[in-house]
Structure formats: structure tokens, C-alpha cells
Design a protein with these regions (language model features):
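Outer-membrane beta-barrel "beta-signal"
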Residues: 540-542, 566-579
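Outer-membrane beta-barrel architecture
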Residues: 27, 48-56, 78-82, 90-94, 161-167, 173-177, 247-251, ...
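Sec-dependent N-terminal signal peptides
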Residues: 4-14
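Extracellular/periplasm-exposed beta-strand and loop segments of Gram-negative cell-envelope proteins
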Residues: 106-113, 127-159, 184-245, 264-311, ...
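Transmembrane beta-barrel strands of outer-membrane/channel proteins
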Residues: 55-61, 95-99, 178-184, 223, ...
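Outer-membrane beta-barrel strand-turn architecture
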Residues: 83-89, 168-172, 251-256, 316-326, ...
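N-terminal, post-signal peptide beta-strand-biased segments of exported outer-membrane/organellar beta-barrel
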Residues: 15-117
Length: 579
């Protein structure tokens, strides 16, 4: 199951590449029904309708996740601008640069099982527990126990977004535009990808040393005894991705309508690498006894691919007059998407066991489990929308729309699975007794298919009040219905028997062929999700240069209006404009 879910998640990520990274508070507070300056600045042809110089910084809160009064945010550096003065006649441009580098300590909880309270903390916790005992009741300490624990749980994220948009008016009714985008992202964490010895899935890294020994210096009559146990889990997962976008657009702009064509190309690479190690070592020095177990899980998932999209939009205008603050329009859009990418996936689990007991008998075991596939994927997608933006009067703007997106991606390729194990037994460490070798191999064709459809219906309302019309209330809702169908199929073309070969010291050999049940899962499921999100906000047009906006006034479960939690949850945006 783990392999299939991972494969399908990459398909979903690829099909949704380059979702918009910045949004205006007008758009967010009306459920996506009404657009603001930021949406226009990102559109290669609508950019030309912006006038003046618009400046964006960290105070603009374009991610809508910063809570200024709580001093809580995404810790990013943001610099952006949109201008109609680009030193070339009839050319307008916008530039956005966003960078973040965040190291986040994660929660740690561990019960050492020694009668003490569980260890708790964040990031890294180091603790040492010690105990002295008198086991023979002669009023002298003769037994020492200690447990030293180092626990780590952290996450690091880096991301850089760069967007350049240019819009040029070729003639009175024709605008050409271009947008370039580059996103580089990286993420690393030290949480286990699967169960390994002491660790469950998503457990944090650990290093635990337990010592138990007799204290002959404290009590000379006690016998010599010393035992050491070390449990260690060192987990590492890193994900890096790079995406480049190029988009060209053209708009034929007439008095009552306009027609726009967008052609977009996206190229991306993604690499996911996991190297998880878990080990346990137990040694009793006085008896020359030890057990050494090591487990290593290595996963590499890489893909590179391309998405090409063609989209057209027809927009009928409700002519702007002095009566309305914003013009209205009815927009119809239809698009087509094709995606192609190559993927390579490998997953190896290596297990080693070395054991010497009190009689110098030795037992060793090495087992390897490998799975891999190479596949090519092709995808087709269709999208369409209809959006009505209508001024009900000189103070009220209504926005309502419907968006539909259907996407299908099919991946086909070859897979291989192998299992190898070797076990040996010795007496007196070097006197070989027997060995057991087990092996099995399977290969075949793999087909992974993902079908997704999303229907979104936003409704938004904006009302300007007070005599000077400097204040506006905004309300919005977004209904979304998402259906996902996931399928996977392994069709073996070769399966060798799972063979067990026993070889004894007298030279005899026994070979057994065991029944084999494939560990590779075939999957087919359908998931339907319905959701409705409500949004709201306030806008204050302080003057022609400064606009202050608020988003998300009330948090869920917060029934009190003016309290500390309410104030700290406010999300504000400051927008600057110069003529």
C-alpha cells in the first residue's frame, strides 16, 4: 500500500503544479469570486489594466497566513511590484520574489519505561537517568543502572518563488503578455518512513544507551557484571523540487467584449530520498555475549516531466460608468491540458543480525528486500469556468462562478521485486554448522491510473459603506466537490519459486520450494469529498496611496468577539499605490 499511495501522490502533485502562490485579500475574502490587484498583476494580459505603481512587501500578507498582532507568520522575505512605468512605451510589468528558510522543532514525547514521567520537549531532548541499588542488603551500593537518551525531531523547509510578468499593447485593441515563473523548494525531516525496531511510522530519531553493572569498588564481595544496550534510530527524508513556467498570452480587447488565449508550458523535476537506519546492540562483557541487529530502509523516487496547457477566455463587459467603483463582466473559459513525465522508483530494505551466545555459538542473518519500477506517464485534462461579476448598485458588487477541472493520468512501465536471505550457524564462533539461503524474484508490468474531477462554486459579495465610501465589508463562500479514482495493477510476466536451500556441515543439501503470495498490492478505490468554506473581511481605503484589509475575523470555536484570541487571529494586509 505504501508504494501505491506514494506513486499516486506524485501524479496529483504533477497535475496541480504551479497553483497560484499569491492572492489578494479581496479574492480570498469573497471565496475567490472577485479579483483584486494581485490577480491582475499575475495575469499577462489583465496586467495592462493596472495603472500606477503597486508595491508589495511582507506587510502585504499575500499568503494570507500572517497574524500580525500575534507575531505569527510564515517567516518569508517578500519583495514585489507592479508598474505601468517600465521605460518602454506601452509596456507594463510586475515582479514578485519570495524566499523562506524555516527550521521547525517538532514535539517529542517518549516514555523511557523506568518509572519516571515521559520525556517531553521540542527539537532535541537529552536526558540521563541514574539509579544505585543495594541488592545484597549489606548497606553498600553494589548495582548501578543508567539510561542516556538523545531524541531529535525537527523539520526544515526552504522555498524560493520568482515570477516576472510583462504586458505590451501592440495596438489599441491588442495586448500581448508573457509570464515566467521559477519555484525551488526543499524539505527535510528526521521521522521514520515505516516501522523499524523501536520506531513506528513517523517516529522521531533516537539514541538510547542503557548500562547495568555491579560496583565492585563500592562492594568488593559482589561479582563482576556489566551489560550494555544501545538502541539507535537515525531517520532522514529529503525532498527537492524545481519547476519552471513559461506562459504567453494575447487578448483582443473591444469595447463590449474581449477574447484571450493563454499557452502555458511547465517543466518540473522532483526527487524524494529516504535513508532510515535502526540498530540495536546488546553486550555482556563478563560473558562475551552480544546481539547486533541493523536495519536500513532506502527509498528513492524521482521524476521529471512537462505540462502543456491551452486556455481561452471570452469576457463580455458591463460598461464601466462613474456610478460604479468596479466594472462588471461575464467571463467564459475553456481549456485543455496535456502532461508527460518519466519516473523512477526504488525501495530497498536490508536487515542484518549477528548473535554470539554464552556458549560461543554464533548466528548470522542477512536479508534484502528490493522493489523498483520505471514508468512513463501521459495525462489529459479539461477545465472550464463561468464567472459573473455584477455591480448591483454603486456600493454593492456581486460575484458568482462555477469552475470545473477534470484530469486523467495513466502511468505504465515495468516493475521488479526480489528477496534474498542468508542464515548461518556456528559453534565455537568459527565451527560452521549449517547455512540457509532463501531467494525469490518477480517482474512484470505495472499500470497506475489516477482520475480526478473538481467542481467549485464561489459566491462573493462586497459592500461599500459610510458616506465617503472608504469602508467595505466582504463575504464569500466556496463550495467544492472533489472526486478521485485511484487504480493500480501489477501483472507479473515472470515469477520464480520462493526457494529455500539448506546446506549442512556433512555436505548434504535440502531444497524446498515454498508457496508464494505476492506482496505487491493491486488497488482500486474512489473517494468523494464535499466541502464549503466561508470567508469574510473588511477593507479600508485610507487614501489614494494606502489600503488596509482584514481577513478572517472570527476563528472557528471562538464565540467571544473582543478577546485576546480574536485580536491575535486577525490577518491584515497593507497595499501601497503611487501614481
Amino acid at each position: 500500500m505504501r508504494r501505491i499511495i506514494l506513486c499516486l501522490s506524485i501524479i496529483l502533485i504533477t497535475s496541480l503544479a504551479f497553483a497560484q502562490n499569491f492572492n489578494s485579500f479581496r479574492n480570498l475574502s469573497t471565496g475567490g469570486a472577485l479579483q483584486g490587484e494581485v490577480e491582475k498583476a499575475f495575469d499577462p494580459v489583465d496586467l495592462y489594466s493596472l495603472n500606477g505603481i503597486h508595491l508589495f512587501s511582507g506587510l502585504s500578507n499575500l499568503s494570507a497566513n500572517d497574524k500580525i498582532f500575534a507575531n505569527d507568520g510564515e517567516s518569508y522575505f517578500l519583495l514585489g511590484a507592479a508598474s505601468d512605468k517600465v521605460f518602454i512605451k506601452n509596456l507594463k510589468g510586475s515582479l514578485f520574489f519570495k524566499f523562506s528558510d524555516v527550521q521547525s522543532p517538532k514535539a517529542i514525547t517518549y516514555n523511557p519505561g523506568i518509572g519516571t514521567t515521559p520525556l517531553t520537549g521540542e527539537g532535541q531532548v537529552h536526558s540521563k537517568w541514574e539509579m544505585y541499588k543495594d541488592t545484597n542488603n549489606n548497606d553498600l551500593y553494589d548495582r548501578y543502572e543508567s539510561k542516556t537518551m538523545t531524541l531529535k525531531n525537527s523539520e526544515e523547509k526552504q522555498k524560493m518563488d520568482l515570477f516576472l510578468v510583462l504586458s505590451h499593447k501592440l495596438r489599441d485593441d491588442l495586448v500581448m503578455g508573457y509570464r515566467f515563473g521559477y519555484i525551488n523548494a526543499g524539505e527535510s525531516k528526521n521521522a521514520a518512513r515505516q516501522e523499524m525496531q523501536l520506531a513506528d511510522m513517523d517516529s522521531h530519531s533516537y539514541d538510547i544507551v542503557t548500562i547495568l553493572k555491579n560496583l565492585q569498588d563500592f562492594d568488593p564481595i559482589i561479582s563482576q557484571y556489566e551489560k550494555t544496550n544501545r538502541e539507535k534510530g537515525d531517520f532522514s527524508t529529503e525532498n527537492t523540487s524545481n519547476k519552471i513556467q513559461n506562459q504567453i498570452a494575447a487578448m483582443l480587447d473591444r469595447e463590449k467584449w474581449d477574447l484571450s488565449i493563454y499557452l502555458r508550458n511547465e517543466y518540473g523535476t522532483d526527487k524524494d530520498i529516504t535513508d532510515d537506519k535502526a540498530s540495536s546492540y546488546e553486550e555482556e562483557l563478563s560473558a562475551d555475549y552480544y546481539i547486533d541487529k541493523n536495519e536500513n530502509f532506502i527509498l528513492k523516487d524521482e521524476y521529471k516531466g512537462m505540462i502543456n496547457q491551452l486556455f481561452g477566455r471570452f469576457r463580455y463587459k458591463f460598461l464601466e460608468t462613474k456610478r460604479f467603483r468596479y466594472p462588471g463582466n461575464l467571463a467564459l473559459g475553456l481549456g485543455f491540458r496535456h502532461s508527460f513525465f518519466k519516473s523512477n522508483y526504488t525501495e530497498d530494505t536490508i536487515y542484518e543480525h549477528d548473535d554470539i551466545d554464552f556458549l560461543d555459538d554464533r548466528y548470522t542473518r542477512i536479508a534484502t528486500d528490493k522493489y523498483s519500477y520505471d514508468a512513463d506517464a501521459n495525462g489529459l485534462g479539461f477545465m472550464g469556468n463561468v464567472v459573473l461579476t455584477y455591480p448591483l448598485n454603486d456600493r454593492t458588487m456581486l460575484g458568482v462562478g462555477m469552475f470545473c477541472d477534470i484530469n486523467k493520468v495513466k502511468r505504465e512501465g515495468d516493475y521488479a521485486f526480489s528477496y534474498d536471505a542468508e542464515t548461518s550457524s556456528f559453534t565455537d564462533v568459527s565451527d560452521w554448522q549449517y547455512s540457509t539461503i532463501a531467494y525469490q524474484y518477480e517482474k512484470g508490468d505495472i499500470t497506475l491510473e489516477d482520475i480526478s474531477s473538481t467542481l467549485s462554486v464561489p459566491v462573493g459579495l462586497e459592500y461599500w459603506f459610510t458616506n465617503n465610501m472608504k469602508w467595505a465589508m466582504r463575504f464569500g463562500s466556496m463550495f467544492k466537490r472533489t472526486m478521485k479514482i485511484e487504480k493500480s495493477l501489477h501483472e507479473p510476466t515472470l515469477i520464480t519459486p520462493r526457494t529455500v536451500q539448506d546446506e549442512w556441515a556433512d555436505g548434504s543439501v535440502d531444497i524446498t520450494h515454498l508457496p508464494y503470495v505476492s506482496e505487491l498490492e493491486n488497488l482500486s478505490n474512489t473517494k468523494v469529498i464535499n466541502s464549503t468554506d466561508l470567508s469574510y473581511g473588511i477593507c479600508y481605503q485610507a487614501n489614494k496611496n494606502l489600503k488596509i484589509e482584514l481577513l478572517g475575523m472570527f476563528e472557528k470555536g471562538n464565540t467571544e468577539l473582543w478577546n485576546t484570541d480574536f485580536i491575535q487571529s486577525l490577518k491584515l494586509s497593507f497595499s501601497l499605490k503611487f501614481d
